[in-house]
Amino acid sequence: MEIDREDGRTPNQLRPLACSRNILHRPHGSASWSQGDTKVLAAVYGPKAGTKKNENAEKACFEVIWKPKSGQIGKVEKEYEMILKRTIQSICVLTVNPNTTTSVIIQVVHDDGSLLPCAINAACAALVDAGIPMKHLAVAICCCLAENGYLVLDPNKLEEKKMTAFAYLVFPNTTLSVLPEGSSVAEGEPVEHGIITSITHGVMSVDDYFLCVENGRAATASLSAFFRKNFQQSSSKAG
């Protein structure tokens, strides 16, 4: 039985999406990404010469700096930085600019749920805007398990508080289907059935987890279509 949520959405329905790129002048690339009332800004600086200690100088290095809307960053934000860094390293070509560091700054504007996936989508758009060579794009989504056993996608803040478990899922998206012609893309392995990042919190059964993955992957079609439309519009304006 399909249940309607408090905001009127069906379980698998995403909130309205909005994305703008090249919105800041100082960074090499920038983007804002909104899902409903959740909004994040992402800025990319680099690549700059040199890598930090304990980084592989033979590859491109990425650092992620998370800036909350207010106050200092805590344990959760540090975890977000680590997840974002690993995700970015998975989708970017690390052999093109060896011994360099690219900084990705995430600024939270408003958090109304599904904050980390929103930040990942913003970072991906900003990396494209900066012209960073990428193996493929990433589309991120949050899938939650409610107390009644129903799964819902892209929860808002109120829904998050009522959930017993949730999964942050990041799927690869073929760059050829999204990026305009002439963009920096490297040939990579087939990624149609892959998953880049999977983070779970709370307790859910194996069956529920795989259902999350199935529903999440299905929902990325609309995210990918939105990416494609946004990038093509930006490309035509630039042309």
UniProtKB/Swiss-Prot annotation:
It is found in: Nucleus, Nucleolus. One of its GO terms (cellular component) is exosome (RNase complex). It is an enzyme of class 3 (hydrolase). Disulfide bonds: none annotated. The keyword Acetylation applies. Probable component of the exosome 3'->5' exoribonuclease complex, a complex that degrades inherently unstable mRNAs containing AU-rich elements (AREs) within their 3'-untranslated regions. This is Exosome complex exonuclease RRP46 homolog. One of its GO terms (biological process) is rRNA processing. Belongs to the RNase PH family. Signal peptide: none annotated. The modification N-acetylmethionine is found at residue 1. It comes from Arabidopsis thaliana. The keyword rRNA processing applies. Keywords: Acetylation, Exonuclease, Exosome, Hydrolase, Nuclease, Nucleus, RNA-binding, rRNA processing. Probable component of the RNA exosome complex. Its EC number is 3.1.13.-. InterPro entries: ExoRNase_PH_dom1, ExoRNase_PH_dom2_sf, PNPase/RNase_PH_dom_sf, Ribosomal_Su5_D2-typ_SF, RNase_PH. SUPFAM superfamilies: Ribonuclease PH domain 2-like, Ribosomal protein S5 domain 2-like. It holds the Pfam family RNase_PH. GO terms for molecular function: DNA nuclease activity; double-stranded DNA binding; exonuclease activity; identical protein binding; RNA nuclease activity; single-stranded RNA binding.
